[in-house]
A protein has these predicted regions:
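Conserved PLP phosphate-binding loop immediately N-terminal to the Schiff-base lysine helix
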Residues: 1-11
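Conserved core segment of the aminotransferase class I/II
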Residues: 17, 21-86
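Short hydrophobic/aromatic beta-strand micro-patches
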Residues: 41, 120-122, 162-164
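Conserved glycine-rich beta-strand-loop-beta hairpin in the small C-terminal domain of fold type I
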Residues: 86-97, 108-122
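Short, conserved charged micro-motifs
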Residues: 126-132, 169-173
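PLP-dependent enzyme catalytic core of the Aspartate aminotransferase-like
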Residues: 138, 154-184
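Residue-level detector of anion-binding/catalytic polar loops
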Residues: 142
Length: 184
């Protein structure tokens, strides 16, 4: 939903007709976590999934809120909000990447995301992203170490940086502090 360069990749479900594929989604990025609304798309297991939800004594959510969200989407406001969010993210990420390019030195490199707000930075051989992230927390610098995103705890020399902030003096100072942390 948050792709701003090129078109969004198709979900795995588009590449096969397997009944084993289930697609989950939510409105978290537009509505926030308080609403807890999302969707599930599956080919042959939807009744079983709904039954399991009831068995686990979970509710299906607030019906008035669901109706309001359906009206919001039917009126095209969801798509309009997504377009606005994509433009804001593209601008913020581009500005953040320019700053990142200024503060990072070898052996660090990064890749520009095609959507979302995270930028992946690659450290040199032997760089321990988890150790640096832990040290950064003590200084108020938040990095997402690569092993957090790997089931095999790989990507030890990668970390993610959130570039979604409006780029004023404070975030720029944070990146400069991050650079100092990386060169220690």
């Amino acid at each position: 939903d948050l792709t701003y360069r090129g078109s969004a990749p198709a979900p795995l479900m588009a590449y096969g007709d397997s009944d084993q594929i289930t697609l989950f989604g939510s409105f978290l990025h537009v509505l926030g976590p308080d609403f807890g609304l999302g969707w599930v798309v599956t080919r042959n297991r939807s009744e079983a999934m709904i039954a399991a939800k009831f068995r686990n004594n979970l509710t299906l959510g607030d019906s008035a809120l669901q109706r309001a969200l359906a009206d919001y989407m039917a009126a095209g406001r969801y798509e309009r909000e997504l377009r606005h969010l994509r433009r804001r993210l593209a601008t913020a990420v581009e500005s953040g990447a320019k700053l990142l390019q200024q503060v990072l030195s070898r052996p660090f490199s990064f890749s520009m995301p095609a959507g979302g707000y995270m930028c992946w930075v690659r450290g040199g051989h032997g760089f321990d992203a988890a150790h640096v992230a832990h040290s950064g927390l003590k200084r108020g610098i938040v990095l997402a170490p690569g092993p957090m995103f790997s089931p095999s705890e790989g990507f030890h020399n990668f970390f993610g940086v959130n570039l979604s902030a409006p780029w004023g003096q404070y975030p720029a100072n944070q990146l400069a502090r991050m650079s100092e942390l990386l060169t220690r």
